[in-house]
Amino acid sequence: MNYLFTSESVSEGHPDKVADQISDALLDEFLAYDPNSKVACETLVTTGQVVLAGEVKSNAYVDLMEVARRVIHRIGYNKSSYKFDADSCGIFSAIHEQSADINRGVERAEAMSQGAGDQGMMFGYACNETDNYMPLSLDLSHLLLTELAVIRREASAMTYLRKGKVTSYLRPDSKSQVTIGYNERNEPVRVHTIVLSTQHDEFVTPADDSKEAQEAADREMLQTIYNDVKQVLLPRVIAQLPERVRTLFDDQLILLVNPTGKFVIGGPHGDTGLTGRKIIVDTYGGKGGHGGGAFSGKDPSKVDLSLIHISEPTRLRC
């Protein structure tokens, strides 16, 4: 190998992604009832709390709290033990009218003369490592977490017996990171390292109240999760890949699962989430350029969003 390249992804239950999805859902709701809505919606999520802020100009009425709770419930935050759940979290809105000074630069008499809401730099990027022209390290990172969410919802694997019922031990928050090795011709030659961290229930009960018993239970949980990632998740992901990518997996793969040892406390309770903090995950995983603008909660008059979509069909293959 000549060099290594790494990209990461985060799940739908990661705090920053929870915030992104709430902002996007509010945007969708405004546009559904008023396609000319101007929206810039930011969200903060933390222990038991959601804060909505931003600027909106629209003729639509949107039940902000209902939309936010719907998103949180769909993601899977529906248990009080998570310290952040759809039914009981408090929601505070500070959304207000869009600035007239900004609006005058956006809305024009002729639709084709519409202005941009701001300046900015936007980049498109493509490569031939995958069928969707995305970097392989990012594509695999996304796929790992997408499949992990499927497994969580199916609750037929990565489970334990709780009160006589088979239950998934997976919780919504997770992250992945994939490192690819390249040769001197910039071609991927092997999957070097996979790091996967997933939030989980406390599904092994310590033998007693001692520190040693708790540590033994933690080790047992970690070993179970590691085995399930290796024997359940990875085979399901690899089965979805084209043959040329499958051959990049070998017995030298370094697999790190929950490397801190335990991940029960997570989601917005474990780490405050904000809209727009995963811009590299949302684009090209560190390859290509990025102007710094986020996508979520913005209507198409915001060029951070619209010009990225315009650039997608015209990306040059590298």
Feature-to-residue mapping (PLM):
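N-terminal, positively charged regions that mediate nucleic acid binding
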Residues: M1-A40
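Glycine-rich, mobile lid/loop segments that gate access to catalytic sites or pores
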Residues: T6, G48, G76-I265
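Conserved phosphate/anionic-ligand binding catalytic regions in large, soluble enzymes, centered on
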Residues: V10, H14-A19, G115-T130, V264-G288, ...
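A generic structural motif
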Residues: S11, E55-A60, C127-N132, Q199-P206, ...
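Short, charge-patterned binding micro-sites
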Residues: A40-S58
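Active-site-surrounding "flap" and adjacent substrate/cofactor-binding loops of secreted or lumenal enzymes
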Residues: S58-I72
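Active-site pocket-shaping loop/turn-to-helix segments
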Residues: S296-L307
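Residue-level detector of conserved catalytic or cofactor/ligand-binding positions
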Residues: I308-C318
